[in-house]
Amino acid sequence: MTASPVRHVPVLGREAVAMLAPRAGGVYVDATFGAGGYSRAILAVADTRVIGIDRDRSAIAGGFALVEESGGRLTLVEDRFSNLAAVCAAEGADVVDGIVMDVGVSSMQLDEADRGFSFRLDGPLDMRMSGHGPTAADVVARASETDLANIIYIFGEERRSRAVARAIVAARRDAPVATTRALADIVSKVVRAKPHEIHPATRTFQALRIFVNEELDELIAALAAAERVLRPGGRLAVVSFHSLEDRIVKNFFALRGKTGGGSRHRPEIERAAPSFAILTRRPVTAGQEEVSANPRARSAKLRAAERTAAPATADDGESPGWPSLANVMRGG
C-alpha cells in the first residue's frame, strides 16, 4: 500500500489557485512542482488535468503518490520549467488553461543539508536543483575575484560584494571552500551581523544559488513560454520571493499588458494589442496568519494575468547582460 503523501501547504496557495479559477476539463501546468501543493489544490477544485514540471528528481519521485491518488489526472515531468512549451506539446497539450509558478528554492531543498542550499546547515557547497552542472563550490573555486563580486552584487544585491569576493579568493588560496559552513564563516567575517537583520551570508548564498541554477534566465524563458501556450482566457499566476524575481515578473506583465513599442532594452518589440490583461495591479501578499505559520511567506508576492487573443510577442525571452554560468566557468 502506498503511503499517504505529506500535505504541503504552498505559499499563497489559496490565492494563486483562485487566480487560476480551475474549471472541469481544463489542463493546468504546475511549472515548479516541488512538494506538489499547488497541484493538489488545483486537482481538488475541479475535474482537471495537471502537468507538473520540476528539474529536481527528488521532487518528481516524491510526487508519485499524488499521481496515484489523482487517478491519472496528474502527469509529472522531470525538466526545467523554461521548457514548459515543449513539455506540454509532448504531453498532447498544445494550449493550456492555466499555469502556476513558485519561483526559487523550495523548503524541501533548504531543509536538506546535503543539497548545500542553507548556511544554517553544514553540508557540501552544492546548491544545484537538478544535480547536473557546476556546483556552487566549483564557482567559488574557479571564478575570478571580479566575476565573484559581480555575481554576489547582481544576484544577491550585496553591497559589500567586492569585500566578500576578496575574502573568498584569499581563503581558497589556503584550502578549498567546499562546505556551506566554510563559506558562511568567510562571509560573516566581512559582513557584520546587526540585531534583527538577516544572516550576513544570506545574500551571498542567494546569489550563488541563483547563478548556479541560472534561475533568472529560467524565469524569463518560462514567462515567454507561458505566453505561447496559454489559450485566450488562460491565466498565469507567479509567486516570487525576492525583488529580482518580482521585478522580472512585474516588467513582463507590464510590457505584455500594453500596445506599441517595447521597453528601452527591447525597443524592436511591437504589439498591436496586449497579450495579457493584468489581474493584480498590486502584488498579493500573505496575511499575518500565513506568515506566522510559515515565515518564508513574509517576502512572497503573487502576480497574475489573463491571456488575451492577441498573438504572442515576437520575443525570445533574452536575458539582460548579467554574468553567464558558462562564461564564468570557462574563464570568459
From Swiss-Prot:
InterPro entries per record: RsmH (IPR002903), SAM-dep_MeTrfase_MraW_recog (IPR023397), SAM-dependent_MTases_sf (IPR029063)
GO BP, one annotated term: rRNA base methylation
UniProt entry keywords in alphabetical sequence: Cytoplasm, Methyltransferase, rRNA processing, S-adenosyl-L-methionine, Transferase
EC main group: transferase
Subcellular location, record wording: Cytoplasm
Chief location: cytoplasm
Sequence segments annotated as region (Disordered): 284-332
An example Gene Ontology molecular-function term: rRNA (cytosine-N4-)-methyltransferase activity
Binding residue positions for S-adenosyl-L-methionine: G36, G37, Y38, D54, F81, D102, Q109
Entry's EC annotation: 2.1.1.199
Gene Ontology CC entries for this record: cytoplasm
Reactions that this protein is recorded to catalyse: cytidine(1402) in 16S rRNA + S-adenosyl-L-methionine = N(4)-methylcytidine(1402) in 16S rRNA + S-adenosyl-L-homocysteine + H(+)
Chain's role: Specifically methylates the N4 position of cytidine in position 1402 (C1402) of 16S rRNA.
Entry's family note: Belongs to the methyltransferase superfamily. RsmH family.
Stated name of the protein: Ribosomal RNA small subunit methyltransferase H
Source species: Nitrobacter hamburgensis (strain DSM 10229 / NCIMB 13809 / X14)
